[in-house]
C-alpha cells in the first residue's frame, strides 16, 4: 500500500482504503518502480565501495604471475590494494605562493 496514492480512514469495522483507482495499471506500475528504486538505492548504499571500485578499475586481473616468487606476488598484491584503498575523507591543501 503506497502512502502517496491511498488514503486510510477509520470506519466502524476497521481501517478502509478510500482510494477507488488502486487497481489502475499506472498506480501499480508506479508502485513497482518505487519499490525497485528503493531496493537499488539500499544496495547501492551498502556496496558502493565495491561497485565504484569495479567501475573505476574495471575487471582487470593484472599481469600473469606464473614463475614469479610468492614474496613478489604478495608485494604486488599489497601495492595494488593500497592503490585502490583511497580515503576520500581527507584532502590535501596545496597553497601556491
UniProtKB/Swiss-Prot annotation:
Virion surface-side positions: 1-22
Positions of region (Disordered): 62-83
Side of membrane Intravirion, spans: 44-97
GO molecular function terms listed in the Swiss-Prot or TrEMBL record: monoatomic ion channel activity; proton transmembrane transporter activity
Residues carrying Phosphoserine: 64, 82
Transmembrane parts of this sequence: 23-43
Entry keyword set: Disulfide bond, Host cell membrane, Host membrane, Host-virus interaction, Hydrogen ion transport, Inhibition of host autophagy by virus, Ion channel, Ion transport, Lipoprotein, Membrane, Palmitate, Phosphoprotein, Signal-anchor, Transmembrane, Transmembrane helix, Transport, Viral ion channel, Virion
UniProt cross-references to InterPro entries, sorted A to Z: Flu_M2
Residues of the site described as Essential for channel activity, possibly by being protonated during channel activation, and by forming the channel gate and the selective filter: 37
GO cellular component labels: host cell plasma membrane; membrane; virion membrane
Described purpose of this protein according to its UniProt entry: Forms a proton-selective ion channel that is necessary for the efficient release of the viral genome during virus entry. After attaching to the cell surface, the virion enters the cell by endocytosis. Acidification of the endosome triggers M2 ion channel activity.
Note: When the channel is activated, one or more imidazole moieties of His-37 probably become bi-protonated.
Family, similarity comment: Belongs to the influenza viruses matrix protein M2 family.
Protein name from the UniProt record: Matrix protein 2
Native source species: Influenza A virus (strain A/Chicken/Shantou/4231/2003 H5N1 genotype V)
Amino acid at each position: 500500500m503506497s502512502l502517496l496514492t491511498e488514503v486510510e480512514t477509520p470506519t466502524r469495522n476497521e481501517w478502509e482504503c478510500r482510494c477507488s483507482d488502486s487497481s489502475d495499471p499506472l498506480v501499480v506500475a508506479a508502485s513497482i518502480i518505487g519499490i525497485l528504486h528503493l531496493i537499488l538505492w539500499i544496495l547501492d548504499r551498502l556496496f558502493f565501495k565495491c561497485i565504484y571500485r569495479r567501475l573505476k578499475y574495471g575487471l582487470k586481473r593484472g599481469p600473469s604471475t606464473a614463475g614469479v616468487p610468492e614474496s613478489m606476488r604478495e608485494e604486488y598484491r599489497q601495492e595494488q590494494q593500497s592503490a585502490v584503498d583511497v580515503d576520500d575523507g581527507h584532502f590535501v591543501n596545496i597553497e601556491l605562493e
